[in-house]
Amino acid sequence: MSDSIVILGAARTPMGGFQGDFSALAAHDLGGAAIKAAVERSGVSPDLVGEVLFGNCLMAGQGQAPARQAAFKGGLPQSAGAVTLSKMCGSGMKAAMFAHDMLLAGSHDVVVAGGMESMTNAPYLMLKGRGGYRMGHDRIYDHMMLDGLEDAYEAGRSMGTFGEDCAAKYNFTR
């Protein structure tokens, strides 16, 4: 491969507040807006995009293949592949790393990578709903907490505490 791997365009949506101005927009709506803007800024024809890699962790209730939905909403053609990645806070970065690898391997010449999320639109979950509740009380789970903000291995521990622990251990500053 003789060409350098470069970032040609970048875009993001403004930071939204929980249940704020972007409440009516699903993650794939926000991702689609970012894709559209990044591709326009790049000057590359949307028809040249070979693959879309987009991180999204809170997928419940969005429908199948959120990255594919975002790609279509971003004006990309059906010929572009799309993969949704779920690696918690690192999903968008991992998407960019995979994009680099695809470009380096020559799998594609143009790849769109990023991440999208809407905590506001994360639904509540009834984990026993499929099999049926028989008698008595049970729980409804907050998808945002269960699959996003609480550690899966240490029940009830907020993911933010890991960042605080790393900051203290390695003397990171804001």
Language model regions located:
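Conserved "HGTGT" condensation-loop signature of ketosynthase/thiolase-family condensing enzymes
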Residues: 1-80, 118-174
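Active-site-proximal alpha-helical scaffold in enzymes
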Residues: 87-117, 159-161, 167-174
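Short pre-catalytic strand/loop immediately N-terminal to key active-site residues, enriched for Gly-Thr
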Residues: 79-89
